[in-house]
């Protein structure tokens, strides 16, 4: 452990060559609980120079919230050597948030602990925003819904980062996050939105729920969703007029296309984000 002070030379902080050796940037994790301060202090007193911080879960599985299951899945499996528990139950899984500082502005990359479900303002929809539950994609999934905030203004409430909804365990975590949002905000969705891909678990749930509850369902093409979200962000920031004509270009892997084939990118023109 070494503290770098103002005025120190760049050589004051040295890292092992194996740490992010091919990356131009480093991430910094701040201790956000008193327990982490105690762990860091104990490590320093025992001349431990490094601690590995990672989420408590198996690969492709949700974070463990139950001590018994954590013991079974993490300790018995050899992932960890010991388990430090607490007498307070964990109600909701939250990963560490990840942010970047761009031109002096903090830009969230992964909104989770400390950020979600903080609302994002949608002033262009004031007075016209129905309660729409958006079920998210399959990879790096979140859930979102639109409704009025405490001040009566239109807003989008985004869940914590959930991860890749590809199996029963992660779908259960997705479902738990959705249920918690609905209970917390007393939601009564007037419509549902999901990814166009027919095999995504979140989309399958949305289609079945829309059928059972006789709700409108909007199926959104994957790349189109990226372009629309970038447009909405620019409108909220005042950089784009609501009726501006836009050429959107999205390169983000593959996604189900409106013609039934798999698309790799999308060039899209729109008279407005609506």
Question: Each predicted region: which residue ranges?
Answer:
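Active-site-adjacent structural elements in enzyme catalytic cores
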Residues: 1-193, 197-212, 261-264
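Conserved small/polar residues in nucleotide/adenosyl-binding loops
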Residues: 268-273
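Short hydrophobic/aromatic-enriched beta-strand-loop microsegments
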Residues: 51, 216-221
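Phosphate/diphosphate-binding loops
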Residues: 76, 80-98, 219-235, 239-263
């Amino acid at each position: 452990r070494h503290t770098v002070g103002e005025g120190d030379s760049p050589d004051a902080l040295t890292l092992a060559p194996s740490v992010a050796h091919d990356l131009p940037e480093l991430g910094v994790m701040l201790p956000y609980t008193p327990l982490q301060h105690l762990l860091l202090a104990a490590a320093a007193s025992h001349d431990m120079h490094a601690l590995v911080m990672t989420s408590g879960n198996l690969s492709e599985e949700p974070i463990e919230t139950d001590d018994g299951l954590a013991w079974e899945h993490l300790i018995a499996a050899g992932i960890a050597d010991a388990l430090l528990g607490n007498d307070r139950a964990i109600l909701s899984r939250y990963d560490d948030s990840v942010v970047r500082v761009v031109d002096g502005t903090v830009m969230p990359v992964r909104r989770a602990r400390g950020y979600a479900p903080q609302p994002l303002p949608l002033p262009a929809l004031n007075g016209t925003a129905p309660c729409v539950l958006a079920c998210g994609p399959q990879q790096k999934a979140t859930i979102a819904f639109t409704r009025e905030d405490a001040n009566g203004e239109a807003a989008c409430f985004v869940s914590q980062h959930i991860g890749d909804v590809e199996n029963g365990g992660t779908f259960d975590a997705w479902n738990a996050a959705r249920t918690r949002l609905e209970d917390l905000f007393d939601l009564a969705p007037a419509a549902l939105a999901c990814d166009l891909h027919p095999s995504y678990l979140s989309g399958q749930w949305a289609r079945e729920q829309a059928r059972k509850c006789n709700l409108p369902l909007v199926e959104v093409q994957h790349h189109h969703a990226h372009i629309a979200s970038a447009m909405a962000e620019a409108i909220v920031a005042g950089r784009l007029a609501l009726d501006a004509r836009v050429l959107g270009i999205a390169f983000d892997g593959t996604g189900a296309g409106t013609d039934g084939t798999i698309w790799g990118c999308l060039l899209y023109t729109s008279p407005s984000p609506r």
